[in-house]
Amino acid sequence: MAGIAFHVGSQTVSADPYLHALDIARELFEEAEAAGLKLRVLDIGGGFPIPEPKVKFNLPEMLRQINARLDEDFADAEIWAEPGRYICGTAVNLITSVIGVTERGGQPWYFLDEGLYGTFSGVLFDQWDFKLISFRGGDEKVAATFAGPSCDSLDIMFRGRLTVPLQVGDLLLVPSCGAYTSASATTFNGFSKAKFVIWERVKAEVEPVVAVGRVEMNQSVAQAAK
């Protein structure tokens, strides 16, 4: 046995759960040493948070407290960490479209081309509160149910979610989809996983075309002004 690993849970916004786990780990290290087993590795897992609109946290202060406790109680141990969501969570955004609209029980239902068996698996497994941002304007808001494309009654992501009224073909932006989405997505019922578009590549292809268009437009304006 080389060491001990723990995980405090995803999107942990306080150092307290880590400090509590470190107290337990310290006791286990001491018990192991008393039994003649020298542990040399401590894996503090993941759980480091990414920004969310309604969640406040001070990550530098969290890390300061964790590091101080590690220096105090585990100075001789090899420290591992698994910052999964923290590394890739904000690196990917999803664009999903409305493929069906109906009404049930007096409430609109919007069916998307991505569902619980795809990118939104985190709703079930991580209780992750995905944000839905509509490109459609308007001040009117309705409480709606959002479901995925499969025929499974489990494939429902959100109930009572406030949104502007939507139509088939409308697009929704879902930010921060880089963690535990495509990795756990399936092809259930024959639906393909969401395709990736690398923004830097698209930008490199589009910018020269846009630049040429701007030059031509400026030349036309200059000609018209003469």
Predicted regions: what they are:
Residues M1-G100, L154, T163, N189-F191, ...:
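Active-site loop/helix belt of alpha/beta enzymes
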Residues Q65, D76-K226:
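Charged (often Lys/Glu-rich) extended helix/loop segments that serve as interaction or gating elements
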